[in-house]
Amino acid sequence: MIKKASLLTACSVTAFSAWAQDTSPDTLVVTAIRFEQPRSTVLAPTTVVTRQDIDRWQSTSVNDVLRRLPGVDITQNGGSGQLSSIFIRGTNASHVLVLIDGVRLNLAGVSGSADLSQFPIALVQRIEYIRGPRSAVYGSDAIGGVVNIITTRDEPGTEISAGWGSNSYQNYDVSTQQQLGDKTRVTLLGDYAHTHGYDVVAYGNTGTQAQTDNDGFLSKTLYGALEHNFTDAWSGFVRGYGYDNRTNYDAYYSPGSPLLDTRKLYSQSWDAGLRYNGELIKSQLITSYSHSKDYNYDPHYGRYDSSATLDEMKQYTVQWANNVIVGHGSIGAGVDWQKQTTTPGTGYVEDGYDQRNTGIYLTGLQQVGDFTFEGAARSDDNSQFGRHGTWQTSAGWEFIEGYRFIASYGTSYKALNLGQLYGFYGNPNLDPEKSKQWEGAFEGLTAGVNWRISGYRNDVSDLIDYDDHTLKYYNEGKARIKGVEATANFDTGPLTHTVSYDYVDARNAITDTPLLRRAKQQVKYQLDWQLYDFDWGITYQYLGTRYDKDYSSYPYQTVKMGGVSLWDLAVAYPVTSHLTVRGKIANLFDKDYETVYGYQTAGREYTLSGSYTF
């Protein structure tokens, strides 16, 4: 009997575009339909980043990893740990669904967007990134795309690492995975990272007083996982992690009032699951609990002072997913339930509230001759706004062997968060934000070049905005986003090249003005090679012009921010089979630029690190 992976591989095409280092079309991904499938059978553009990629790039943050990927635009209010936003294909930062091991990241706060500057890079073993609508599979938020951060380690062993760098950066990490008998595996990790940072000098955006201090970041992380195989088909796991972060930043100064310029974030997450992995049928049941407490306070008064603010969120989820091989493809179905609660006294929500959501979904994948068809439909029942349905469909045609045309259409939405509904400025009558997206793409393998080019359009309605006059949130905005994305990877002798180009025209559909903080064009290029046992890497990124607001005076003025070209250089050397040393220069030519108006970036930075494995 043919197993699922073999069958799906057999029905997949020979070679299609893959952006990351591992360019095999048979690389398995789980994010598209919640179960493993060869990447070549996923019609949506998909990128996989491995832990080996992260180590080779010597990334010290999740944002540094994501900024290298097609369609991603990262903005940040300064350096490490400072507030950041992820824009995928021009959509809002709140239109990106971030998963941790397939479970929605707990998001505290009124923005409803993921700030991955706070998520420890030490936990990341793999990232799967899908562009385009995915609400028909996952529900709310998946308008621009899905980022699935996977913490599960692939190989046993122990690693001890340490790193130092500019701005008094230091990082110490110990992780181990051990086999207990033939069927049980234990993983443990501890990580400490700290930087004094630098002065982001956000004068004008923070009131009338400049705050000449270093804006540092401290993070402490613990992780543990236990996995057990009951039989060849049945397995289970228990997993938990937590991190304790402190960030200093430049806050708005008001004479006579405490200066809330310190952020303290506590986050913990626990999940357990049971999986059945048969030859034709797969099923999994996962439950999770997460709790985050996000304080902003004046350190002279403490985080429990009446002037401090607190965002506290608890999230409970249950997921039951199933997949069965049918013909040259599969059919999947599942249900997931989520409950989010806030605690009375939370900064943006005066009283305790909860929001519950139950979703049922159906997915399908099938190959018929030279055609591949993919579809999904989902219905969500939300305690705040009732029932909402989404769907998507894609078709791929291999018109010549190794060349494929893809067309897709999908709907998606963004649910309201508790802060927007019941916060100080909340509006309980808000509707969800909605999206309709079209995409057409060609991809293939030509003379050793694995390439893909696509064009897309995204119409977003009922966007939630804030009214300065009524001091309330309301539905009124509309956005029209058009874009082109091109990716390619190829080898020339010992050199490996990976390149992408993005053109994004993201506009307010009512006023025809550009959406803020999105670069209109981006070029990204990665060059890797090995010479005399040294592993070298050069990263280039061009960020095009973008617009932002100058909040130093009212009425706020729109400002145009120029483009910039950035270069990084990284090198690694294996001293022995166990010990590797690495060095990196980020922003090699020390360019001055901003991604958020008024907030400086770090300039040239150096890091030196070493790791010992056994």
Curated annotation (Swiss-Prot):
The chain crosses the membrane at residues 158-165, 169-178, 184-195, 217-227, 232-248, 263-277, 279-296, 309-325, 328-337, 353-369, 371-381, 385-400, 403-417, 434-443, 449-458, 473-490, 494-509, 517-529, 535-550, 558-572, 585-596, 602-614. It comes from the Bacteria. Residues 1-20 form the signal peptide. Cyanocob(III)alamin binds at residues 83, 85, 92, 110-111, 251, 309, 517, 551. Keywords: Calcium, Cell outer membrane, Ion transport, Membrane, Metal-binding, Porin, Signal, TonB box, Transmembrane, Transmembrane beta strand, Transport. Gene3D superfamilies: TonB-dependent receptor, beta-barrel domain (2.40.170.20), TonB-dependent receptor, plug domain (2.170.130.10). GO terms for biological process: monoatomic ion transport. GO terms for molecular function: ABC-type vitamin B12 transporter activity; metal ion binding; porin activity. The keyword rRNA-binding does not apply. This is Vitamin B12 transporter BtuB. A motif (TonB box) lies at residues 26-33. CDD domains: ligand_gated_channel. Ca(2+) 2 binds at residues 213, 215, 249-250, 261. The keyword Cell wall biogenesis/degradation does not apply. A motif (TonB C-terminal box) lies at residues 597-614. Residues 38-152 form the TBDR plug domain. It is a multi-pass membrane protein. InterPro entries: B12_transptr_BtuB, Plug_dom, Plug_dom_sf, TonB-dep_rcpt-like, TonB-dep_rcpt_b-brl, TonB_rcpt_b-brl_sf, TonB_rcpt_CS. One of its GO terms (cellular component) is cell outer membrane. Belongs to the TonB-dependent receptor family. BtuB (TC 1.B.14.3.1) subfamily. Residues 155-614 form the TBDR beta-barrel domain.
